[in-house]
Amino acid sequence: MLRSVRFYSLGTDWPSSEQELSDRLAKAAFKPCGPYVERSSGFEPPIAAQPELFARRVAGTDLMRLRSQIRVLPAGALNEALEARLEEYRARMQEEPGRRTKRQLKEQMRDELLPKTLVRSERTTALFILSERVLAVGAGSEARADRVVEHLRAALGNLDATPFELARPFGELLTRVFTGDGPRELVLARECRLRELRDEHGTVRWQNVDLAHATVQRCLKDDMELTHLGFELGSTARAVLDARGVVTKLELLGQDALAEGTEGALARQDAETALVGGTLRELISVLRRALGNEAAAAPRRPASPESLGAGSTPPHLSLVTA
């Protein structure tokens, strides 16, 4: 259901019932792309067996799904068609087209080609954990997760949703778990990524290794900091948490057995929603106990790995064992 998760804290009221939430999302339902529209987004029923409902509430968790349809117009195809049109212009006018003319011709070609393009859809699942008042969006991409929040805001009319930040930075928790001083619920797994604190910002990635080994632990003492750390949440899940609080590679350890023991598509979907919701609820609770509840002015987190070394590629070392 969710492989990557971005959390958002909510500061406004949430619909009190499944039906109320469904009715509001239905007003922002998905509509296919028009011939001249590059992207169209809206909510769709998350459960195929219940096409009349745009939300499903199970065990204190609301399940929603945003669908986006995108017209695929490759830049290469547009440029090739534009070049042919420019050649026609040169032959007809006996002059080189100016910047304004090129822009106008490009817009004309785009309008001609767009209705003929193929479309593709992407679906993003979101869960609202009622007891924690946290929205979990199943997207690793910040832009994709923010799109879900913006469409929820439009559907609900008023939604104060901000990225999940606690009193102390997530990097502190990564270090504590890595050194064996973290919460007992979080068990060190076999994957991590570290970044140099020096200007070069080189990175080292360890995978499928014992992170408690002295060689790996020494990296933290050699002027490096953790940006990603694999962990196991008790016996329920394993995942990777980064220094911004984003969860990736989420894997529910009991999901296969649960699916085998459940009959019916709706029952399986409800069981999965309850399992994922309960796992995320437990993780949020652990994070809050370890780092303190949301603060009005949370400490600034380290820059994301993607923002480092602008204009150049930092050195990277990946260490993987079988």
What are these regions (language model features)?
Residues M1-A322:
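Intrinsically disordered, low-complexity, charge-rich terminal extensions
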